[in-house]
């Protein structure tokens, strides 16, 4: 993808960002299931350190991780666009259009399974997939490792992050995963309201949250502080051409045919267009899709039924959804090693 899609101002300085992960109102998060924890869980073999997060940030923004050195992870996961790309479906190597929308990486640290079809279980498993995918960054991992080893400035960064382990596919994946664990949603008006600020959201948004939990049935799948059950559902999207089987490719069960992972709703105001195929430009269109009970009834999830929402109820739901978006973090492009 062209660099024009990547904003030059992108979250918190690294030291503040890392500190933010480790301190905060964990007690409040435990007391209110709709408030996310202020820390990112990490596996024992890849606990977060400032050095690992810094290495991962460098790799994430480095276009040298792609075949033609023309795109980085941030080309598709742009911080100023909610860590997505603002396109209906992703654009990869040589401007090749992919079949699915770029998912946000916000709060992926809280997800036990990754990607639209769940084919990767951890951030470490997922991290290098786009790099070597022919349609995405198209750089074989052995070639990537040799390229990184040829850049003198990376040697000390890898050593500081993973002493004695060298520059390998494992340390590249762990570094990227470490940075991605710091990509967390910022405080939204909804969060401030849940913490006691009654003026943080409108009466319309408050009513929308009530609808979200009952009549509209949204919380059946979009539950908890990350607004996802991390499950897979067929929501009846219209498709053109060959149907995308979704989770069925990984788990060939009838219920999984056409099913895709429930995305987070955090920062949803920044991640249009919506759905796994980018088919809706606005949140109102999304609400109307669910109000219809979906369009393609083939293998439809049992929870997808017509809702009979009124016009004002739809407006209230949109107001609530918009309240889930915080201020974009002020990430700055790092100086890359030479």
Regions found by a protein language model. Give the residues of each.
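Periplasmic c-type cytochrome electron-transfer domains
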Residues: 5, 11, 27-338
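Bacterial N-terminal signal peptides
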Residues: 13-25
